[in-house]
Regions:
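Aromatic-lined ligand-binding clefts that engage carbohydrates, nucleic acids, or primary amines
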Residues: 421-436, 465, 532-556, 563-564, ...
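Aromatic-lined substrate-binding rim segments of carbohydrate-active enzymes
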Residues: 65-131, 203-208
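An active-site-proximal structural segment forming one wall of the substrate-binding cleft
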Residues: 103-120, 143-180
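Catalytic-core region of carbohydrate-active enzymes that cleave or remodel glycosidic bonds
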Residues: 208-209, 213, 242-337, 341, ...
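The substrate-binding groove and active-site-proximal loops of carbohydrate-active enzymes
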Residues: 50-61, 85-103, 140-160, 184-195, ...
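Aromatic- and acidic-residue-enriched segments that line the glycan-binding/catalytic groove
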Residues: 94-102, 113, 123-149, 199-204, ...
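N-terminal carbohydrate-binding accessory modules
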Residues: 26-79, 109
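Active-site neighborhood of glycoside hydrolase catalytic domains
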Residues: 154-231
Length: 617
């Protein structure tokens, strides 16, 4: 959808971006060079210390990009690092989207307008606590395809993607006078495999895509450099607090000629549902940053600004046994918090960078205050059971991907002959299920807790079995990655007998759709609608989800993200540009909804509430 210039100007003002900057488009810019040489990085032949910070345009409302970039410049950074998430741009094979919040080229141009260079991480694998590590779910439709391998089917899909991305971004390299100084090949492959031929395949794809006028490089943990690097490219290293000196010592042993750079210095961490909010060691981080800068080493702080994994885009961790889905917020304890506000860490890092570089940064921009939205009564609702689409019938169970579905929920329905008593067993559940007998909730199963069995006692001669499954976020890192099909993978058995003959209902819920709400009571899996009025200029706010159980929230048709009463996150960030003066609509889908619930507005986030380990109740 195109937005008129005046509308964009209004959105820009909401994020506090009022200064005028010179346009880049159409300007004649001389070519420059950025290469690794003589043990360091060279910009136009002169030594250059990269002081970068990571933030992802997909996790930030477009109207706020410029505001966040100015905050980066004011902290003393000279570059911005960003992933490009493949699934964000190619939702279906051969269907590409670089519009609106997906306009990565405009994000790069805006960085240049703010005097920042750009380090690009196009993958094709990203990680980043993003669903499936940035891979599109449709790769899993072919059960024989193996991602991150030399499988010809995977390589063909990755090549087509990178060639298309090159059309957007290759013109924006430093060799063309634009801001992209470096492009990463794959991502931390040494923590996954050691196939150097595969890494060469990815490097060749990037070259063929036109990324020849910026410095290619690889990134790994220090000990994994031999497995994930390429001898002809610089290798940068990723590590966390307290590991700087040891990690660089290892890199020096492996790459005596340098250059020395931390591609990810972890200045925080992410949170999992049902686990405590991650503690922060700002003192150690300040010491590490100071030490690296004084050595003359380059660094990219991960994250400078985390933002939000809006909608269904959070990932998960797994070592092949456990499953740990990530929360919606990607605050990360970063210098700039989830809503773009500087934290004490921001000012501490700013002081260190200024001291160690001798460069005084621009003043820190003023940030508009937050607001408290009025309390919203979820007075209108409709049961999920009244909104089901036409099913697909299959004797065998099918995954989401087999039905061309990427996110949301999927319902499996079959008829049972009873009476029967025994365990309902799901071979492989991805990821959370509510089980119903004749429309009545019989129990839940949670992959996070290793649950895949539920005792049932069915007295009726005929009964309807419904298994409502949520894709809680595909694993984004580790050996489980290739098998991250969503839904039920494998068989379902009851009392030892395989169940066959299923009606399967895809429920992607990318938007709530046009539903027929009523004021009749609605309990169980229900959609609810409420409205509230903004009487002043919209400002950032937060929705308190403490009264809700498990599900998703949309604001004016935009998916804000997930909620789950297991904690630790109990608010959802509402960016000011997504609010409208006047009437605003909130839609909630709650797996265990109750009529009459309320959502309170808050002027601050709640990301560290007490956690529950048990399933949602």
């Amino acid at each position: 959808m195109m937005v008129r210039p005046r509308a964009w100007a209004w959105l820009v003002l909401l994020c506090g971006m009022v200064a005028t900057v010179p346009a880049v488009a159409g300007a004649q810019t001389p070519p420059h060079s950025f290469v690794a040489g003589h043990g360091q990085f060279l910009l136009d032949g002169k030594p250059f210390q990269v002081i970068s910070g990571e933030m992802h345009y997909a996790r930030i409302p477009r109207a706020c990009w410029r505001d966040r970039l100015r905050m980066a410049k004011a902290m003393g950074l000279n570059a911005i690092t960003t992933y490009v998430f493949w699934n964000w741009h190619e939702p279906e094979p051969g269907v590409y989207d670089f519009s609106g919040n997906r306009d990565v080229a405009e994000f790069v141009r805006e960085a240049q307008r703010e005097g920042l260079y750009v380090i690009l991480r196009p993958g094709p694998y990203s990680c980043a606590e993003w669903d499936f590590g940035g891979f599109p779910a449709w790769l899993l439709k072919d059960p024989t395809m193996v991602v991150r391998s030399r499988d010809p089917k995977f390589l063909a899909a990755a090549r087509a993607w990178l060639l298309r991305l090159g059309k957007e971004l290759a013109p924006l390299q430093i060799g063309n006078g634009r801001p992209i100084i470096a492009v990463q090949v794959e991502n931390e492959y040494g923590s996954y495999g050691d196939d150097h031929a595969y890494m060469e395949d990815i490097r060749r794809m990037l070259v063929d895509a036109g990324f020849t006028k910026a410095q290619l490089y690889t990134a790994d943990g220090a000990k994994q450099v031999p497995r994930g690097s390429l001898p002809e490219l610089p290798a940068v290293i990723n590590f966390g607090p307290g590991e700087a000196q040891k990690s660089f010592a290892t890199l020096k042993q492996l790459r005596q000629d340098g250059p020395m750079m931390s591609g990810e210095y972890w200045d925080g961490w992410f949170d999992h549902w049902g686990a405590p909010h991650t503690a922060d060691d700002a003192d150690q981080q300040a010491k590490d940053l100071d030490w690296m800068l004084r050595q003359g080493y380059s660094v990219s702080i991960y994250m400078f600004h985390g933002g939000t994994s809006f909608g269904w885009m959070n990932g998960a961790n797994s070592n092949g046994k456990n499953y740990e889905p990530d929360v919606t917020s990607y605050d990360y304890n970063a210098p700039l918090d989830e809503s773009g506000r500087p934290t004490p860490k921001y000012y501490r890092f700013r002081e260190i960078i200024a001291k160690d570089t001798g460069v005084t940064p621009p003043p820190v921009p003023a940030v508009p205050p937050t607001m408290t939205a009025p309390t919203m009564l979820l007075a209108e609702g409709i049961s999920l059971w009244k909104t089901l689409p036409a099913p697909t019938h299959s004797e065998q169970l099918l995954s989401m991907e087999a039905l061309n579905q990427a996110y949301g929920y999927i319902l499996y329905r079959t008829q049972l002959d009873g009476p029967v008593t025994g365990d309902l067993v799901i071979d492989t559940l991805h990821d959370y299920a509510q089980v119903y007998i004749n429309g009545k909730l019989a129990g839940t199963m949670d992959r996070r807790l290793g649950q895949h069995e539920l005792p049932l006692k069915i007295a009726a001669h005929h009964a309807r079995l419904d298994i409502l499954v949520e894709n809680t976020g595909r694993v984004n890192f580790g050996p489980a990655l290739p098998g991250e099909h969503a839904g039920i993978v494998g068989r379902v058995r009851l009392a030892g007998k395989p169940l066959m003959g299923w009606d399967i209902y895809p429920l992607p819920m990318l938007t709530p759709g046009d539903l027929r709400y009523s004021k009749q009571p609605c309990d169980g899996p229900c959609f609810y609608r409420a409205t509230f009025t903004v009487t002043t200029t919209p400002k950032d706010t937060f929705l308190n989800t403490s009264a809700l159980t498990k599900g998703e929230v949309w604001l004016n048709g935009r998916a804000l993200g997930r909620f789950w009463n297991v904690g630790p996150q109990k608010t959802l960030y509402v960016p000011a540009p997504w609010l409208k003066p006047g009437r605003n609509e909130v839609v909630v889908f709650d797996l265990k909804g109750k009529s009459g619930q309320k959502i309170e507005g808050l002027d601050h986030p709640v990301l560290h509430a007490a956690v529950l380990r048990s399933p949602a109740e």
